[in-house]
């Protein structure tokens, strides 16, 4: 009886945890690190039924090499924390519009104390939507950053999930990253000719994910991605850049788990 009562009380609440190890780290369309990184994404909240799902999120990134710390050890890189609201609109039996809105803060702490940019916080608003259907799922993300990182970023693409052997799936996807002129400079760097970047698409990524549904609450996955900077001027700027992770083409991958309770 107590177990049934506890299950009834806890059922509206949820926790999602996704730990990953990646061979490199691409953040908002920019190759930030070409060495292994560990990422943990945690979400928790309350399912309010017709009013959506309210919660909090935390995204931690840590280096698995000593490159990102002045003390030459594995380094905590940055964390993101914010409030979230998710809402689904049922358009028909097989079509659902899913929305995810967040107000978050990104905090850089604990490495390279000689650089002010290594110890800072900025905030942002973000909306993500996807149209879930039996065919091809289109999706996009729009993020506006403030307080020292004033730029607009977007991501848009499509994906298709294929299920086989009951508990396995294969999901190919393709998407572009881009944004305002400030975002373009953040991703590519300064132009060799001294001109200002225009807003637009800065990169395209091809992704292939293979997953295994271990049980109702746990799935495991591996993925591979091909990252490509687009545009002749942008690729030339990458070639001329002294940034240690300046690669106009990059292949990487990772492994991870998805847990939901």
Model-derived segments and spans:
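Cleavable N-terminal export/targeting peptides
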Residues: 1-16, 245
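Short glycine/proline- and aromatic-enriched beta-strand/turn motifs that initiate or cap beta-hairpins
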Residues: 9-70, 85, 252, 258-260
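Repeated loop/turn-to-beta-strand initiation elements of outer-membrane beta-barrel proteins
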Residues: 15, 49-56, 92-99, 133-140, ...
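Outer-membrane pore/translocation modules
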Residues: 18, 58-157, 236-251
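Residues on the lipid-exposed face of transmembrane beta-strands in outer-membrane beta-barrel proteins
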Residues: 19-23, 40-46, 83-87, 101, ...
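Structural signature of outer-membrane beta-barrel domains
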Residues: 22-26, 61-65, 104-108, 143-147, ...
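Detector for outer-membrane/organellar transmembrane beta-barrel domains
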Residues: 118-204, 209
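Predominantly the C-terminal beta-signal and adjacent terminal strand-loop region
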Residues: 206-261
């Amino acid at each position: 009886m107590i177990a049934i009562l506890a299950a009834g009380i806890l059922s509206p609440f949820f926790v999602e945890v996704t730990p990953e190890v990646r061979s490199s780290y691409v953040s908002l369309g920019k190759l930030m690190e070409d060495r292994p990184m560990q990422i943990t994404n945690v979400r928790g909240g309350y399912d309010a039924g017709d009013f959506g799902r309210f919660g909090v999120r935390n995204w931690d990134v840590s280096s698995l090499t000593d490159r990102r710390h002045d003390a030459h050890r594995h380094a905590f890189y940055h964390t993101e924390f914010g409030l979230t609201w998710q809402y689904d609109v049922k358009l028909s039996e097989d079509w659902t519009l899913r929305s995810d809105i967040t107000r978050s803060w990104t905090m850089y702490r604990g490495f390279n104390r000689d650089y002010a940019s290594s110890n800072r916080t900025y905030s942002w608003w973000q909306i993500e939507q996807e149209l879930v259907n039996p065919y091809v799922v289109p999706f996009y993300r729009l993020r506006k950053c403030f307080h020292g990182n004033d730029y607009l970023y977007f991501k848009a693409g499509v994906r298709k999930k294929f299920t086989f052997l009951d508990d396995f799936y294969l999901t190919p996807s393709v998407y572009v990253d881009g944004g305002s002129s400030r975002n373009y400079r953040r991703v590519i760097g300064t132009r060799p000719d001294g001109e200002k970047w225009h807003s637009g698409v800065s990169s395209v990524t091809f992704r292939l994910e293979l997953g295994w549904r271990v049980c109702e609450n746990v799935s495991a996955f591996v993925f591979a991605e091909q990252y490509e900077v687009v545009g002749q001027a942008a690729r030339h700027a990458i070639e001329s850049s002294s940034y240690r992770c300046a690669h106009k083409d990059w292949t990487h991958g990772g492994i991870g788990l998805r847990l939901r309770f």
